[in-house]
């Protein structure tokens, strides 16, 4: 949710067109511009035992009205590589600080999608989403 909220904020500031960022996508949705963010498989490193991995992989599927607008959003997201963002949020009445580190952006490519209202573009991010402080 931290990553989805951050990406929604970025996209809102990047374009005047309305995009919806969410965890799942359905062709029954009437949304014309959608980015889904889902955890993806990949090599995950941990220090010991059952602690959280140092980083995760997230697949971004970008569905828009043209390949060009999907590509432009993809390029904007690709520019996050190397950035380290600390976000302060309130969760269940408590302040929390979360760290987002964007390490790698792989496989950006157009995807075939049989829904005639939208075209797609997808890529996978390797990034850290980690709670670093809680009140």
Describe each model-derived feature in a short phrase.
Residues 1-50, 84-99, 135:
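Small/polar-rich, solvent-exposed N-terminal microdomains that initiate assembly or binding
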Residues 1-9, 61-74, 131-135:
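Short N-terminal helix-initiation segments at or just after the protein's N-terminus
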Residues 40-43, 54-59, 79-83:
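Short, low-complexity, polar/charged sequence segments that are solvent-exposed and flexible
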Residues 47-53, 113-116:
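Short, solvent-exposed beta-strand/turn "edge" segments of beta-rich domains on protein surfaces
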Residues 52-70, 119-130:
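Oligomerization/assembly interface segments of phage tail-like spikes and tubes
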Residues 66-90:
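Mid-chain, well-packed structural core segment of small domains
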Residues 82-128:
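Acidic-leaning, charged glycine-interspersed low-complexity segments
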